[in-house]
Amino acid sequence: MSKNVAEYFACDVFNDEVMKARLPKAVYKALTKTRKLGVPLDPTYADVVANALKDWAIEHGATHYTHWFQPMTGSTAEKHDSFITPTDNGMVIMNFSGKELVKGEPDASSFPSGGLRATSSARGYTAWDPTSFCFVKEGSLYIPTAFVSYTGETLDKKTPLLRSMDVLSEQSIRILRLFGNTTATKVTSTVGP
């Protein structure tokens, strides 16, 4: 007998409902501001978010996390790391910091750059995109990220999309102000019905 989709849809997604239940009120509010307005998240709050995310992911069967991004190759890429840290007494502890959540450093030499950088300057960084929800799949916590070179050039398909959404919002707010709307703070563009 099959389950109703509504019973399990998004059950492995660290969505707004889960965040609200698991994060302290001040941290939830700060993260919501980051997600909706682009306000930088305080690094101490990033540690709290990372800890809640790790605990939730472990409860959903995750032992690893990955910074997940879409390089210019037309596919997806992942850099996996483990929550597991061995201890001196033969046990393990599960660790995940705000620094590990916010930024990763994969080798970018195998990804096309459109001639933006020399191969010797192949270091690239992933940066957490808090506007997309994290999720658990096959024992790994997937952290949606943007991917840029060490000098800031775009190496993925997501970064230009995020930048264009910001510009579109900014210009839409200008138009709304011309029409007398003084309360809107952001315009969100979507695709589809």
What do the PLM-derived regions correspond to, one by one?
Residues 1-10, 134-137, 141:
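Flexible glycine-/small-residue-enriched beta->alpha junction loops
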Residues 4-98, 102-120:
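Histidine/acidic residue-rich metal-binding segments in metalloenzymes
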Residues 122-193:
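Glycine-rich, acidic/polar active-site loops that bind/position phosphate-bearing ligands
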